[in-house]
C-alpha cells in the first residue's frame, strides 16, 4: 500500500526510473535542470475505486479487503486504519496501478487487480484507457 491521492500521478510514478526523492529535492532547491529524470518505456494505468455516489453524496466507514497482489499495486486516497482494519473514508478510496510493456496490457492488469479489492458500495469505472486504446488502434 502506498499513500497518494492523485490518480494521474499514480499512473506515472511506476514508470519513473530516477530516484523520486532526488527529483523532489531538486525541484524544491531549484536545481531540477541538473538532474537526469528518466522514465522506462511501456505504459501504466491507474483505476480508481470510488465510493458509489462520489462526487456527490456517498457513505463511508466500510471495511476494505484486498488480495496481497492488489495491495502491492494500491495507492490509498480516501481510506483510514481502524486497528488492523482499513476503512473507506472518502469518495476516491483507492487507486490500483499496473505497469506493462503495452497500454492494453497495463489497462487489463489494472482492472484484473481491481477485482481483488472489495468494499461495500465499491464503484469502478469501466472506461479507463478506452479512448487512448481507440486512438492507438486508429494509428496502427
Per-range role (PLM):
Residues 80-83, 87-140:
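Generic C-terminus detector
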Residues 48-50, 77, 99:
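Generic beta-strand/beta-sheet core signal
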Residues 2-71, 82:
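Active-site "cap" helix and flanking loop/linker of ATP-utilizing ligase/carboxylase catalytic domains
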Amino acid at each position: 500500500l502506498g499513500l497518494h491521492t492523485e490518480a494521474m500521478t499514480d499512473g506515472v510514478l511506476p514508470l519513473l526510473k530516477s530516484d523520486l526523492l532526488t527529483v523532489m529535492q531538486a525541484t524544491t532547491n531549484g536545481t531540477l535542470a541538473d538532474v537526469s529524470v528518466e522514465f522506462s518505456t511501456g505504459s501504466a494505468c491507474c483505476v480508481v475505486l470510488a465510493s458509489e455516489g462520489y462526487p456527490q453524496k456517498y457513505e463511508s466507514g466500510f471495511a476494505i479487503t484486498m488480495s496481497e497482489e492488489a495491495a502491492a499495486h494500491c495507492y490509498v486516497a480516501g481510506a483510514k486504519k481502524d486497528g488492523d482494519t482499513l476503512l473507506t473514508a472518502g469518495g476516491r478510496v483507492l487507486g490500483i496501478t499496473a505497469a506493462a510493456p503495452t497500454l492494453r496490457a497495463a489497462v487489463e492488469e489494472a482492472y484484473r487487480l481491481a477485482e481483488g479489492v472489495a468494499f461495500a458500495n465499491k464503484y469502478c469505472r469501466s472506461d479507463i484507457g478506452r479512448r487512448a486504446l481507440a486512438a492507438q488502434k486508429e494509428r496502427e
